[in-house]
Amino acid sequence: MQIRTIIILFSLTFLGCANEGNPSPSEIDLVKLISRSSITYLNRPASIIKLEIQSEDLNIIRYVEIRAIKPSTATKGALVLSTGGFGTNYYGIGLETNTTLNFAINLGLETFEIKWLGSQGWGTETAGIGYPTAVRAYGAILRYLKEKEMTNTKNIIAHGGSGGSFQIAYGLTRFNLENDINHAILIAGPPTADLNQAIFGDKALKSYWPDGIGGFRTTDYIHGWDNQGNYCQNRSQNPPDFVLKELDKSSLLSTSVTTDLNYKTNLIFINTNDETNADGQGRLYFDAIQSDKQWHYIPDETSHDVGGITAGAMKIREIIQTLL
C-alpha cells in the first residue's frame, strides 16, 4: 500500500501556513520520561507515568500522564485510550468506562490511558496551528509506550471518543499511525471530517454542527481566532476566504492537503444518533476510507458520551473481545 501523507506544519502566526515537507513525527515530537509512581486503581496495581513532549518545530513543551494497568496473566496486547475535548481526563472516570477498563484487563490487555495536562491539554500553547499539528504528538506518545512500556506489541488497539477519536484519526490521515496500531475504535465521531460543512455548510445535513456546542470555540482557538474574529462562534456571518481555507486544511478530509485513507489498521466506528451531529461527521470519514472498516450505530441513543452510556459501553466491550 502506498502511503500518501503530507505533514502540514502550521506556523504560529495568525494566518500563516507553511508546508515543510514530510519529516517523521517521531523526529519532531520528542518524548521524555519525567516520573513514575505506583498507585492502586480498580483494586489493581497501576502506574502513573508522566511524560514530557517537546515539539521542536513549534517551540513548545507539553505534558501528559499515563495511567497504566497490566493484567495478572500473560498479555494479549495493549489498549491505548484517549478522551474528548482537550484530552484532560483519564478514560476511566465513571461506572461504564471503568467497567470497560476492567473488562479489557480481564481479557488480558494492558491499558494505557492518556491524560493531557494543563487546562487546555493538547491545546496548550497551540493556538493558531490547526487541529492536525496540535494533536500530532499523539503518535509520538503511542510509539513511546510501544517501545518502553508495552509487554506485547503484536496487537495494539487505539480507542478514543470525540476529540480522543480525532487524535487517532489525524494520526492515520496525516502521520502514518497505521504503522503503529492494529485496530482503532473511534466513537463519537470523529467530529472534524469536514469543518466547513460542520460550521458553515448545509444545515439540513447530519454533518452540520448544532448551535451551542463547544466545538465552535475550540475550533476558533486552535486556529488563532478566539477573541480575534470568533469566526466559528459567529457563524451566522459570512466567513472570510482565509477562514474557509484554514478549516479545509484542518479537516480530516481536506481537499487541499493530501491525506491517507487506505490503512493497514482495521477501523471500527461506534456512534449514537448524536445530539452534536458528531455521527454525521464520523460517517463522512468512514465513507471515505478505502480499507477495512466497520460502522456500528445505536439509533435509540442521542448521547455524545458514547463510552459513558450502557449501550455504547457494551458495544465497545463486544468489539474489543472480537479483536483478541
Can you describe what each PLM-predicted range is?
Residues 101-122:
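Conserved alpha/beta-hydrolase
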